[in-house]
Amino acid sequence: ISPEGQEPLDGSVKTIAQLFKNAGYVTGAFGKWGLGYPGSAAEPNKVGFDKFYGYNCQRQAHSYYPAWLYDNSIKVILPANPYSQDLIHQQALQFIRDNKGKSFFGYFAYSLPHASLEQPDDSILQMYKRKFCEPKAFKYSGNYTGTTIPRTQFAGMVTRLDNYLGEIIIELEK
């Protein structure tokens, strides 16, 4: 089992979050963070982000049904195998709502679309089923989940991301 996280940013590096925070903005990061392992000097909350919710490791972000995500520096065990991108997106929307009327900087690092090609079997995925000529076999190497409908999955993931961005715009315009 590989350790969680990647080599941290050098302490002399200033992040965009630090620049915004120093200018009086509230800052939030949502999604994939791969710039410092848990407990390092480059955790999101230590490099300018007031709020972080997501993966504190790029490798962990290759699974959309992880056993845990991070809420700031706290590892939160996820019950019932929820779809991570929906959880991350809900936290991002809440950050926008919580900071309405304030100057804020949001860093939305969703990992859609990416390996593995997997998502809930909901209306987004359903609208693409039987729309593509799928390859006869599609199997990832390593620990990635294979799928018999990679083009369908990819199209659904792009649409899901597009929906998330639309919801962010709607929330900003309120």
Q: What are the residue ranges of the model-derived segments?
A:
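Active-site glycine-centered loops adjacent to acidic/histidine catalytic or metal-binding residues
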Residues: 32
